[in-house]
Amino acid sequence: RVQGHVYTSTGQAIDPGLTDNIFKLFLQWEDEEGSDKSGLPANSQVYFTQKLKEILEKSDIKDHLHIECVVNALINYEQFHRGDHLSLSPSIDTGYEEIPGGNVKVPKGMISILHSLYDNLPADAVRLGQEACQVLRRDQDVEIMCKFGESYIADHVIVTCSLGVLKACHMKMFQPPLPESKQQAIKDIGFGRVNKIFLKYKVPFWVEGNGGVYLGWKNAELSDKDSKWYKHIFGFDEVMNNPNVLVAWISGAGAEELEKLEDQEVKETCTQLLRQFLKDPSVPYPQEILRSQWVSNPHTLGSYSYWNHDTKSNSYHNLLSPVLNSANEPQLCFAGEATNPTYYSTMHAARSSGLREAERLLQFYRLTPKNQLGEIDSKL
């Protein structure tokens, strides 16, 4: 459920009852997308635009402007969750599923999940600062060449780099080249552009639990969306365990443009947006900001994967399939969110894919998780 209020650009808070009703409809549209094969829209942007037109035709004219604003806010919400502009996503059933149980906030941050994994490993099992540049596959082993000259020999390699890195580097990273089916999967699956902006204030200007501000632009105000990075922002949310911090969610071309801007411009623009949509000129400037830069980060080159117009029903399966040696043994295994056909784009997909590939090797050596730390170390 969307928490907080949707506001118009003139500072009017839209009735929460109307917002809730539209949000429920929006979730229904999501579920129904791709189910009707006749007259299939070209892409998801067209699909949701058509749905907006349909609901306006059935609604009281006095509610039209607010319905329009709520749907446009939710389109930015959907764009953030998909990973990029909705015009890049085909209007079909992609097989994506929500994991049962809903969202979970991790109070100590995601690093605590890593701690739980490597706290049980031998002290020298994890080597940091070793940027792998080349993976040289031979019949009996694999050599990993690192940036500063180090190299490692292994029987098996689990590749966990992002799809963005694979897209940019797989031809020079892997020798011999990856199988054609895997190269095609790397090309065909989309890789998104998503970022967050954290704004830290000396004193919060909002009431705790009521700080959510979602931007409801009118259709007429979005004609220049492609050239205005901030019009890709879905809204501002409170941050768990950080009572004086808001986070802005942004995706698509706006997320990429954001990375090119100076901090001061980002501070200015976010403050002006909050003042405009809250109709409150007293909203202060943040003390400082922190923002992600996933698109330009050379170790990610984007955010997370999504179905685009080239993605096929077997693309994710082809990406996750291991590369075998001549003895039919798994030599290169692939993990990461983009190798999960059902939960792609999520953190739980990334985590479960790593466990999946570890289990693949355990099964290869006929080990069980209980003795993996002892026996697998001696066999590998």
What are these regions (language model features)?
Residues R1-L380:
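FAD-dinucleotide binding site
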